[in-house]
């Protein structure tokens, strides 16, 4: 008995410690970021053993805003620089926060794949974000054309695949399993012939218990170890041993030789899950790029709305002054009364334009605040705050534009949607290995090794007439359970078996259909990727053309505004000398106001074109100094720029 105790201890320890080793993976992948509570003395082993069967702690969704947003509000106004807007968006924007869960979901899928489970897929949707009030207004007034806010990379929202359906050979379950079963039994069997046993019924009391361990491997191998025991007590006087205990230790091995053989087939889900970790990071990066582009557009649109409001207000002041001057001249009799009506009509039109500009400005403030807050405008403090942009639009003459070839090369190397498409093609090629393996016949090698043991005490049940039968049991089988264990480990009564099983599907239509479909799908993805590359080249070239044209339009708008200022000055001088009419002066004032608004709109359009080009070439994060690691953490290290002005 003393010789076998060390072996039993090692065997049971190995069975118990196997689940504890897997617990670290569950904790690292799914546990929340909250620090663990230290365990009380004596509970470490229980915690390690049971953590695989407890629900991991997942931190709840945080719906509050970062302190940065509140710190920017002073005296009821939200003073906002572009740098602050980007930092607040990284911390509070809901689209970015939703996308932060993608890598965590991919990590959970990777954990599932390492256990041999099917993949559930990773989210790849990218939301374009809020639309500027300029687009909602249809570009009315002097704000020209072009939509701000909802910038994005077209045709890339589904790259990577959200749902993966596995075809081909099933992946083995890679999580080891320990099992234990115990049974207590009682049976009574009436006997038609009492001559042999002298009993009208044989009664059996039995106890059995089984334990074992099973594990599958990526090579296509399945190994199971079992330990089976049975103890039987009976009223049969003919048994030499009563009660008797039978025991066996067995090992069974199955190796797949054709279908389902090899690492390339059985670890394909793990490799796909590893690729999906990269996909989830790329999706997050794409969402950050899209959101930052949208916030920058919203900010510059707000600046342009502010400038347009100032232009409209100045136009009202000019119209009012002209009206008052005409009124005085009518009173002294140097001007016809009809000229007052014309001047008053100009004031009304200018005030209407001012009202429209103020409406667009307030709408844009609301849209921007909603993009920068997790609670939108639910907070009265945020809802009532007027947004004061502290940055001015950049003049195009200070901007440099790279050549088309450099821009296309940069987009090919950096755009996350193209990288996602390449990874998806790689995933499909990995999956084809399973479909290819399923085409093969199933040939399995089976081997079994078993050691048997029997022990018990001499039967003391008497015959019906009295007395004991003549018993002469082998002393080797007489003893307790330790005797059975000794027989097992001495391998006194071994069993061996080796064989194979071959299954040949006659038509093999399912496997052939899956392989054909996977190959066709891969070719579709190749064509889709080429289409994406072609679209990227077109988008980059169009964005570059739009930027160049926007610069030219801005320069023309500046020239027009300067000429209109000169024209109005000349018209006012002619009017003072009586060489012009009030109608001509009013018309010139209207033309100048329109030219000023067109200049503001042209500058805003240039800013949007610049953002779109940076987005299409995947250089927008670098342009605005956004670190993707900081974006993933949800905490921007940028100082509050507006408070430093």
PLM region descriptions:
Residues 88-97, 107-121, 166-174, 186-191, ...:
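A glycine-/polar-enriched beta->alpha junction
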Residues 2-6, 10, 20-39, 119-158, ...:
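Acidic, low-complexity, intrinsically disordered peripheral segments
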Residues 54, 60-88, 403:
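Regulatory alphaC helix of protein kinase catalytic domains
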Residues 98-113, 287-312, 321, 328, ...:
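Amphipathic alpha-helical coiled-coil segments
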Residues 76-160, 164-193, 203-207, 212-215:
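N-terminal cofactor/phosphate-binding cores enriched in small/glycine residues
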Residues 81, 175, 206-208, 246-248, ...:
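Transmembrane beta-barrel architecture of outer-membrane proteins
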Residues 178-186, 225-231, 445-451:
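Transmembrane beta-barrel strands of outer-membrane/channel proteins
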């Amino acid at each position: 008995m003393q010789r076998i105790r060390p072996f039993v201890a090692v065997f049971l320890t190995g069975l118990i410690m196997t689940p504890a080793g897997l617990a670290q993976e569950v904790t690292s992948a799914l546990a929340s970021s909250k620090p663990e509570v230290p365990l009380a003395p004596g509970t470490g082993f229980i915690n390690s053993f049971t953590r695989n069967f407890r629900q991991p702690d997942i931190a709840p969704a945080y719906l509050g805003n970062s302190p940065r947003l509140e710190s920017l509000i002073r005296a009821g106004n939200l003073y906002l620089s572009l740098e602050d807007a980007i930092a607040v968006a990284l911390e509070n924007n809901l689209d970015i926060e939703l996308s932060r869960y993608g890598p965590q979901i991919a990590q959970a899928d990777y954990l599932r794949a390492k256990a041999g489970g099917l993949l559930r897929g990773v989210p790849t949707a990218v939301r374009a974000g809020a639309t500027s009030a300029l687009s909602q207004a249809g570009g009315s007034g002097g704000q020209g054309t072009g939509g701000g806010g909802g910038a994005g990379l077209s045709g890339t929202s589904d790259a990577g695949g959200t749902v993966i359906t596995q075809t081909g050979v099933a992946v083995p379950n890679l999580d080891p399993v320990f099992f234990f079963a115990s049974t207590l039994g009682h049976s009574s069997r009436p006997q038609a012939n009492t001559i042999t046993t002298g009993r009208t019924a044989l009664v059996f009391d039995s106890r059995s218990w089984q334990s074992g361990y099973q594990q599958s491997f990526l090579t296509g191998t399945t190994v199971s170890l079992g330990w089976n025991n049975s103890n039987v007590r009976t009223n049969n006087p003919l048994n030499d041993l009563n009660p008797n205990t039978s025991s066996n230790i067995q090992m069974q091995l199955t190796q797949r030789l054709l279908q389902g053989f090899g690492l390339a087939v059985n670890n394909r889900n793990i490799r796909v899950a590893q690729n999906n970790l990269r996909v989830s990071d790329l999706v997050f990066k794409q969402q950050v790029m899209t959101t930052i582009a949208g916030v920058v557009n919203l900010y510059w649109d707000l600046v342009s709305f502010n400038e347009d409001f100032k232009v409209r207000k100045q136009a009202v002041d000019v119209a009012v002054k002209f009206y008052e001057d005409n009124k005085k001249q009518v009173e002294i009799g140097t001007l016809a009364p009809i000229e007052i009506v014309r001047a008053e009509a100009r004031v009304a039109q200018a005030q209407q334009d001012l009202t429209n500009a103020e409406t667009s400005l307030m709408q844009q403030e609301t849209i921007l605040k909603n993009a920068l807050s997790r609670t939108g405008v639910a907070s009265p403090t945020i809802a009532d705050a007027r947004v004061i942009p502290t940055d001015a639009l950049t003049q195009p003459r200070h901007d440099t534009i790279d050549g088309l070839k450099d821009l296309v090369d940069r987009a090919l190397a950096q755009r996350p949607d193209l990288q996602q498409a390449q990874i998806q093609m790689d995933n499909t090629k990995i999956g084809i290995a399973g479909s290819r393996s399923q085409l093969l016949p199933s040939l399995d090698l089976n081997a079994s090794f078993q050691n048997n043991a029997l022990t018990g005490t001499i039967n003391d049940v008497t015959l019906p007439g009295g007395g004991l039968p003549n018993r002469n049991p082998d002393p080797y089988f007489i003893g307790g359970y330790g005797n059975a264990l000794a027989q097992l480990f001495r391998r006194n009564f071994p069993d061996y078996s080796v064989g194979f099983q071959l299954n040949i599907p006659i038509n093999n239509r399912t496997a052939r259909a899956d392989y054909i479909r996977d190959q066709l799908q891969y070719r579709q993805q190749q064509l889709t990727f080429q289409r994406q590359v072609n679209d990227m080249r077109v988008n980059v070239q169009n964005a570059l053309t739009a930027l160049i044209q926007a610069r030219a339009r801005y320069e023309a708008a500046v020239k027009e505004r300067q000429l209109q200022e000169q024209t109005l000055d000349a018209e006012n001088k002619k009017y003072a000398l009586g060489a012009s009419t009030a109608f001509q002066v009013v018309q010139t004032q209207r033309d100048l106001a329109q030219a000023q608004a067109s200049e503001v709109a042209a500058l805003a359009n240039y800013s949007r074109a610049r953002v779109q080009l940076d987005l299409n070439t995947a250089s927008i994060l670098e342009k605005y100094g956004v670190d993707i690691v900081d974006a993933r953490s949800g905490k921007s290290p940028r100082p509050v720029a507006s408070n430093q002005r």
